[in-house]
């Protein structure tokens, strides 16, 4: 993984690479127009892009998708009057374009075409931009944070208090016991999977990780090929059923943590 995308409130401090003094940029004060280097505890590094919070919010909730031209003008107008390379970028849920906002996908398409046809900006992707303009600054992020919850990762484990305001009397006290139950079940299933899977797979956990290949293509030919590779031998019909049940069990053990269920 070369890079990731975070919210502007997920960074704590920043400095130019090579300098000693850090600058506090907590609370969303980071400049989102450049990539940053983040040094990991493992000794490795990763590049981070912090998306433009105000524009992203207006796209998702402020009606900016009502006009593709207005959206293009907002993006193009956000470049600073500097000669150095700059990236103006946003991050929103995919369902924003068409599901939350009818014809939002058309507005986005018009916006991108307008930017290019009018010569207002070059449309790029993170990988290309990072290759051309590597980080000149480094950051330290806020540990245990998330883009969607100001309480860190509280949304997935406790009564963090996030709500839409539609039901002021509601609370999320149910999250803590549900999370504890999910964690207990996950551990119980992991023990079963490892015990039952060692007689079917060369490496049960590698098979679990590689199972994405079957999820993406459930044709009989692909399933047979996958199981033969992971088992190192031809499985009987009964063993095939058992192997697939174990893999599906592990898949659902991960699905129970899907964020939608914790809102």
Predicted regions: what they are:
Residues 7-11:
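Short, acidic/turn-prone active-site loops that include or flank metal/cofactor-
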Residues 4-5, 89:
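Structural recognition of the beta-strand scaffold that forms the well-ordered cores
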Residues 22-263:
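Active-site and substrate-binding clefts of carbohydrate-active enzymes
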């Amino acid at each position: 993984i070369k890079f990731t995308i975070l919210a502007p409130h997920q960074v704590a401090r920043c400095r130019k690479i090579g300098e000693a003094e850090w600058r506090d940029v907590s609370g969303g004060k980071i400049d989102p127009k450049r990539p940053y280097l983040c040094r990991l505890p493992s000794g490795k590094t990763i590049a981070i892009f912090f998306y433009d919070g105000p524009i992203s919010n207006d796209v998702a909730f402020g009606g900016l998708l009502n006009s593709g031209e207005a959206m293009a003008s907002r993006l193009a107008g956000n470049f600073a009057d500097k000669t150095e390379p700059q990236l103006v970028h946003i991050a929103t849920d995919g369902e924003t374009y068409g599901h939350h906002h009818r014809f939002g996908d058309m507005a986005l398409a018009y916006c991108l075409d307008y930017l290019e046809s009018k010569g207002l900006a070059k449309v790029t992707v993170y990988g290309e931009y990072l290759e051309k303009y590597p980080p000149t600054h480094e950051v330290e992020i806020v540990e245990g944070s998330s883009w969607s919850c100001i309480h860190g990762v509280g949304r997935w484990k406790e009564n963090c208090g996030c709500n839409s305001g539609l039901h002021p009397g509601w609370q999320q006290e149910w999250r803590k016991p549900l999370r504890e139950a999910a964690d207990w079940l996950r551990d119980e299933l992991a023990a079963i999977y490892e015990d039952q899977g060692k007689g079917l797979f060369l490496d049960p956990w590698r098979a679990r990780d590689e199972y994405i290949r079957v999820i993406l293509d459930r044709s009989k030919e692909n399933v047979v090929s996958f199981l033969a590779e992971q088992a190192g031998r031809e499985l009987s019909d009964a063993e095939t059923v058992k192997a697939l049940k174990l893999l599906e069990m592990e898949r659902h053990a991960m699905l129970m943590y899907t964020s939608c269920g914790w809102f």
